[in-house]
Amino acid sequence: MHEFNKGVTLIQLSSALAYSHALMNQVVNPGDHVIDATVGNGHDTVYLAKLVGTTGHVDGFDIQPAAIKATTSALDKAALSHQVTLWQTGHEHLADKIATDQPIKCAVFNLGYLPGGDKQIITKPTTTLTAVKAIQERLVTNGLIILLVYAGHPGGATEAQAVLDYATSLDQHQFQVLQYQFINQVHVPPYLLAIQKR
């Protein structure tokens, strides 16, 4: 029988959002080029801009003017606007905005609707997967695509299944895929998918 090691610190399980930030911390370095595929209210955009520093760059996408406005304000407040380009367009147009030979270290998606916004305007399976595939073509070795997947709103379960099916189908010799999810919560919390290029 093994004695419990009293020097081991037990961790508290983090939310999917907190875990996404932990993953970003591990993979993103100053000077990297990263993508916020759904800028929303700008929280992840600001977080990524801090990680890439003054020598890196963030490209952020959102179709909603309110999201671009909120993110611009958050970046201005944090004095990080100079290292971010915001595109008021859907992330499915990423391939038109980011050069094919531009290496991407990390990309983050918060699927669903804009918090505090119109719940009828949601991300869709076809556009999300178009963006994911465009990023995969530019992703560096050990680079990461992080998707926070929300299934509780109308249309969310369909998108969640499409994204999960796609991620599951990826060749394990080219990508490794992690699913991080709490399975006993009744309010359908988001889960995280992380796709890492080998």
Task: Place the predicted regions along the sequence by residue.
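S-adenosyl-L-methionine
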Residues: 1-33, 46, 50, 69-101
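Class I S-adenosyl-L-methionine
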Residues: 97, 156-198
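Mobile active-site "lid"/loop adjacent to the S-adenosyl-L-methionine
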Residues: 112-130
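Conserved beta-strand signature within the Rossmann-like core of class I S-adenosyl-L-methionine
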Residues: 38, 138-149
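Conserved SAM-binding loop of SAM-dependent methyltransferases across substrates and taxa
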Residues: 41-55
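Conserved SAM-binding motif I beta-strand of class I
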Residues: 57-62
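A short glycine-rich, Lys/Arg-flanked "PGG" loop and its adjoining helix->strand segment in the class I
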Residues: 127-141
